[in-house]
Amino acid sequence: MPQGVLPIQYKVDPNLRGLTALGGLPLYLELAHVAGLVEAIRNNLSVRVHGDGWSDVQVVMALILLNLAGGSAVDDIEHLGEDEGFVEILRRAQLQHLRRHERRELERAWRKGKKLSVPSPTAVLRYLKAFHDEEQEKERVPGRAFIPTPNQHLREIVEVHRAFLAFVQKRNPCETATMDTDATVMETHKASALFSYKGFKAYQPLNVWWAEQGLVLHTEFRDGNVPAGFEILRVVQEALALLPEGVKKVRVRSDTAGYQHEFLQWMADEKKHPQWGVID
């Protein structure tokens, strides 16, 4: 094309193969390997230990990449698989974290013409069901706040996160952990969702943010009718258990949800947590 007003010339490349609109995602793929996240998923998650199909690493990494790409629903994962350039990068990356027999199976599938390089929405939904314990639903009482007990796979996810926190602390040591604790009201139109205090159906996860490291230390997904202060002591205790080595001082920041006598007394009693002393 001829040069216009600006000193720029445009050239049309007839070869469209390998183009991608997701050029930033491979950096996160590399980070996942460097941080040991891929290895942590493989060593801790056991959803797909037995059986054919997508491995734990493939599904979890696909979901992470989907969130980074701006996906808002499981169905959006199809957009990743439709990006030819990204798929080529993903295929090469997948071979790096697979075991030998898994690598052979995947290469054999590609030779046979298998097109999918990311799990389908159906496969992802089937995978996510493993983190739901239907038996826990029998414990619900209408009109009361209820938090299901995490099943085995949810506990395994926590161990994956623990490994990532250890990596961050090793690269950027912090002796202080200021834990910002607050709930986030997330509106939803899901039929089974419950109403929040704001008057609409929502979910209200309780999050613990590690201010010095700039990341989520702990989170608990909750129904919309569960108050932020409900069992806040237990959540903070679980967050403390995730702190990696090297942390010597802990502070907790909260809104009125944290103004509970039991909670405040526990933080002030250094005998309850001698490794950190009084928690401010």
Residue positions per predicted region:
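Dynamic "connector" segments at or just before major functional cores
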Residues: 1-201, 207-225, 233-245
